[in-house]
């Protein structure tokens, strides 16, 4: 059963990474290999998905700039957590970066990449659905 669950996760990751607008960059340490300043200057939005129950601070310069959100904030926003309901991610852009490559990072990418049709019968919050349906995002980069 554990093997089957692992196999299903691998299939999910593979399908996600096959999306034409999703790019994966592995073996990169944000803060030493590339700076958050470089990322935020070259991409329109950044989600930090560092695999923690609470958003993990990377302790790197620039991580608190506008338009940079922890994955917990972002997931909380589209799932209706009142603490994050006032978040206003900018999807009126071409490029988004997600820092992290775990399940939550891929969930964030999956939600951002969905089409209007794919949100049919979704339980996503109406305000998030409205923002995502107006998205002009063309590329999602996962680092």
Region locations from a protein language model:
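Beta1-alpha1 glycine-rich phosphate/pyrophosphate-binding loop at the start
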Residues: 1-30, 38, 110-143
């Amino acid at each position: 059963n554990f093997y089957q669950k692992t196999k299903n996760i691998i299939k999910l990751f593979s399908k996600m990474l096959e999306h034409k607008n999703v790019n994966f960059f592995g073996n990169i340490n944000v803060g030493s290999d590339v700076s958050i300043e470089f990322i935020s200057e070259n991409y329109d939005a950044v989600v930090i998905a560092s695999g923690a129950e609470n958003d993990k601070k990377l302790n790197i310069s620039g991580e608190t700039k506008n338009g940079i959100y922890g994955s917990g904030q972002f997931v909380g926003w589209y799932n209706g957590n009142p603490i994050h309901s006032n978040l206003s991610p900018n999807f009126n852009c071409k490029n988004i970066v997600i820092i992290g490559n775990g399940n939550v990072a891929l969930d964030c990418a999956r939600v951002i990449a969905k089409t209007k049709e794919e949100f049919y019968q979704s339980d996503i919050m109406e305000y998030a659905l409205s923002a995502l349906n107006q998205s002009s995002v063309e590329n999602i980069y996962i680092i």
